[in-house]
Amino acid sequence: MENEATVPAGREASMTETNETRRYLVTGRVQGVGFRWFVEHAAVQLGLAGWVRNRADGRVEVLASGPRQKLHDLYVELKKGPRASRVDNVEVEDAAPETNLKSFRIEGTW
């Protein structure tokens, strides 16, 4: 685990909201441009839990859990990316929930 950020007070998902989990695969110029830090910041601001990591194939993988609207908001941010990046595609799929997700963290290359 390289870095871990906790969800700011007041940004936690409401216990009455149903959380969903999504896996995103981001393709383009997304490594070496601060993309993981960009994703971590966006996810924490949205109150999401999960992780982001570089993949050996050049893509960035994101697993995020939270309310459906917040996951959509993250998707919008992923399509933008940080200034130095170029996002060509964002694949999205439902993922099995991971019960140990309490915060959002940056992981190493996988």
From Swiss-Prot:
Gene3D superfamilies: 3.30.70.100. The keyword RNA-binding does not apply. Residues 21-108 form the Acylphosphatase-like domain. Belongs to the acylphosphatase family. The keyword Hydrolase applies. This is Acylphosphatase. Its EC number is 3.6.1.7. Keywords: Hydrolase. It catalyses: an acyl phosphate + H2O = a carboxylate + phosphate + H(+). One of its GO terms (molecular function) is acylphosphatase activity. The active site is at 36, 54. It holds the Pfam family Acylphosphatase. PROSITE patterns: ACYLPHOSPHATASE_1 (PS00150), ACYLPHOSPHATASE_2 (PS00151), ACYLPHOSPHATASE_3 (PS51160). The lineage of its organism: Bacteria, Pseudomonadati, Acidobacteriota, Terriglobia, Terriglobales.
